[in-house]
């Protein structure tokens, strides 16, 4: 078996369903410590959230400094009986590795570790600069005791990163087809319309907020937020639920609430986006409807890593191994790259994401070997 496959199987065998670590960080820490890395295990806390383990490891000194980022926590496997192979048995069948986290994203962490170990072995055990690993156990959960705090801890001790590769499953159909060079932001809120509770048989004595919130939802949904930008598609507002909390069949509710989420580009800041939505609601309601918006806290603004030498270097390494020139993309959901971008340019490139979070999550072993070669090619080019 290849080194990447060995490491991946060891990681997949740890049932690290967020926020549990189940030994996953220990597998990686021992591997890196044995290779000469300085390692730091950190547990972060936050009221109302589970304490979560994290790992920072570094070898070398000075610059350039490349960090490989990722997460060892995984989503629950669902019905284990529905899997072709046990979700945490790390089974290889027909040249394919099965297991929760195979593509999201223990497989990519294994490839990065294998590539780094091979590079160090070929270069006297030290890079011409620094290599580090920034690995959290809190990405699939609330993401409050993970990368965001690990980065803050690293910055306070003087760590400075020049570039980051985050091993999220960026590819859509085949290894090498896509690099995530940015992400849309995410902003959520609740539209609230006030009415007057009353008996359903006497609507003249009540004020039903449901027709009013329905008209507001339809109007807000129909009005585009923007036309997109050079690197992002148009922002989209999606309503997720309309609720009154009313279990009765004969009571007109006093209030209606509609939850929504906005996936937005870089045309506006989140403050400007909030102001835009509130202005539209005010214009639609006038003096006829009593409505307001309650906004959820957000730490997920849109960002873009501008094309440059690092992007070109990664593209070259991918093209050399796969024969494909990857597209630079900003679609999909949020990731921990939204935190990393405040410290250094970050690109996301990992395995193919078609089976992430699904029953029978899996990756071809050939993709593990190819991704290892790509990361190895990045290191060779980076430390020329």
Swiss-Prot record:
Catalyzes the hydrolysis of N-succinyl-L,L-diaminopimelic acid (SDAP), forming succinate and LL-2,6-diaminopimelate (DAP), an intermediate involved in the bacterial biosynthesis of lysine and meso-diaminopimelic acid, an essential component of bacterial cell walls. Zn(2+) 2 binds at residues 104, 140, 357. The lineage of its organism: Bacteria, Pseudomonadati, Pseudomonadota, Alphaproteobacteria, Hyphomicrobiales. Gene3D superfamilies: Zn peptidases. It comes from Afipia carboxidovorans (strain ATCC 49405 / DSM 1227 / KCTC 32145 / OM5) (Oligotropha carboxidovorans). The active site is at residues 73, 139. PANTHER family: ACETYLORNITHINE DEACETYLASE, N-ACETYL-L-CITRULLINE DEACETYLASE. Binds 2 Zn(2+) or Co(2+) ions per subunit. It comes from the Bacteria. One of its GO terms (molecular function) is acetylornithine deacetylase activity. It is an enzyme of class 3 (hydrolase). This is Succinyl-diaminopimelate desuccinylase. Zn(2+) 1 binds at residues 71, 104, 168. Homodimer. Pathway: Amino-acid biosynthesis; L-lysine biosynthesis via DAP pathway; LL-2,6-diaminopimelate from (S)-tetrahydrodipicolinate (succinylase route): step 3/3.
